[in-house]
């Protein structure tokens, strides 16, 4: 009988004899051919030799070296180009021993279109394909929406979609409440609209002082011309601008720059960025990088800067970046960014006056956010460990999935799956399922369909299975879940039903096990709090999905029963009038102006919509 053979030991001596001293990138693989680590080096031979010395390795680096079975190297013309390649490989392959960012979503911008008489103002995220002006980046979507709301109130530039704008025959509600000048019906001239648009762009460029001076002159000219209505409008714009400016920290003479600070505690790191545009702090954002090796704050900051500013066209790179630590590869990072983006970048760690204050703000924010994260993580870990004790498990669950079903009287059923680990919710792994082909209101069949689709997909993709699955329901739902799991041949997955109890109040839940046993937890149980948190999130996610599906159906359901009005005509009506409410308000003559709608059909539509 053959015995299991251990994997062969990597022959580092033979390998290192043939390694070049040129700059480049190296990739380390384990016995299964899976990527372990990606690194760069100015001198590949010296850098790779350092992994195989007899002493001086950190415990985690030693653990990495023990798993190495193969190393591939790629020579590059310079260390800067090695940094660019390293960044791309880390992003695409996600090696487990590299520092990885959790949030890689592109940043939002404000967009002003070009090439039309009445350009629009809009939220934008993603590649900059459309022709126009992009302002940003902003730290998050909320900051963009808050700014758009202010601009709509102050300068009244349109923010509607082009399809709605082109199809309107009368002003919308925004015009009626004084938040739009009505360009869709030419209630404002192209010339006057261009002035409002220019003022909007000046504000977004951070030129508030110059803009206020222009508006002051315009207000005085309007008063002298006895155009008091216009003078009042401009006066209100000046007032709004001054109120916003009073809330900002200003420093004349400084151009656009980012302030990046790194703080660490208990082996966890936090990066915080302040975005300064035209001397004004326009926003901030925190990151919690995953660190697998014994990384210093300098290591983490260096890796972050390379990842962040080589992240593609969605990121605007300012000419100056203030950093909290002096880095050995500061110049290399700047050179790599310049090669990748064509923009010069200067990194500075030694600053004074207002820039020193900005750096202090960023450091304090990093420390505070890190403290909050550690507190939250400790709470989560304690809850996971409590759940382990309650269930008598040998190991703490690492991944928990929870399912819920939502519908209205059995219609438009939606199933949800949420995922938690000891770091909290993994929203990128959340999934929704539109349920079809079951009897209305049959929650058991709905749950069976959701679980079958979910775990058939995970099996097909060879994706990670959860350690524990929570089913929102009692013995009936749990038995369906058990049957699905057994049918799919899945083992080592614990199933638990979460029954709400007779009172259906939080704190009185009963845990139902597949053995038929039940557990009632104390109201102050940390395990119960974790289950409630996950179950409530699954419930929220299911309800949100159901409401979205229901609202989408309602937007067209009123028109579905009209003879001769199929999907194409329904869509044309909604686009022409800008929404269902406008269709309902339209008279027969208005309806007849829509594409493909004759006078006779317009009368038919009107009769159906207004019949009692």
Swiss-Prot record:
Residues 209-244 form the UVR domain. Residues 21-99 form the GIY-YIG domain. Pfam families: GIY-YIG, HHH_5, UVR, UvrC_RNaseH, UvrC_RNaseH_dom. Keywords: Cytoplasm, DNA damage, DNA excision, DNA repair, Excision nuclease, SOS response. It comes from the Bacteria. GO terms for biological process: nucleotide-excision repair; SOS response. Belongs to the UvrC family. This is UvrABC system protein C.
